[in-house]
């Protein structure tokens, strides 16, 4: 699933082509996404100008002079900028035509994403209203996590992947951050010390910033808006490296299933706290 760096990379990639431009048409080929694409999306958007493009967690918001488009890439989606005459591929579901001859094309093979119109304040929409702070913001710090973790028996990995605690951290960056902080992913959140939270928040911020600079992590379906892969996969320390030697201690990387997800870790560098 595209995580915060992939979504931020996408936002930065589409922004120069769309911001300040007028939408001339919306072409919908398949409405059946996680939430149905509105039947009248063309009428809602045609003739409107895109005034800003922002990100909230894993959501991209296209601000128009009236209304908003809320986009989520789902499990396997991506946005790319194409010529309006470019032939669509099998899973290209929505085209947003702009008055510069280009189109924003939404591809989603597994159709877990969304492309919806919001009339009112988008931050009060049920999908956004209860999201936690951005991990790269000053609000996300060790004191905040320590307060939220009090009496939480869930694993620290599940804790930092909870979008109501902090947004945008998925399986890849959770595993990598916990490795660098030397915290076992199955450790109970309430057992994490202030010092460990200091380390963890610092590593989360550094990893996300590095991943954004590298254009995200391409493992299967993610490509940036210009069709290029992300290169942060070459910097991964534990994710996708099961049974390979740890790059620090040379012990074998192992995985454990936490909340239905395989979590990679080094048993030597990340001892479990009992």
From Swiss-Prot:
Cofactor(s) for this UniProt protein: Zn(2+)
Q: Which GO terms describe its biological process?
A: base-excision repair
Tell me if Zinc-finger is a UniProt keyword of this record. Answer: yes
Question: Zinc fingers (FPG-type) span which residues?
Answer: 237-271
Give GO terms: molecular function aspect only.
Answer: 8-oxo-7,8-dihydroguanine DNA N-glycosylase activity; class I DNA-(apurinic or apyrimidinic site) endonuclease activity; damaged DNA binding; zinc ion binding
Family assignment from sequence similarity: Belongs to the FPG family.
What is this protein's name?
Formamidopyrimidine-DNA glycosylase
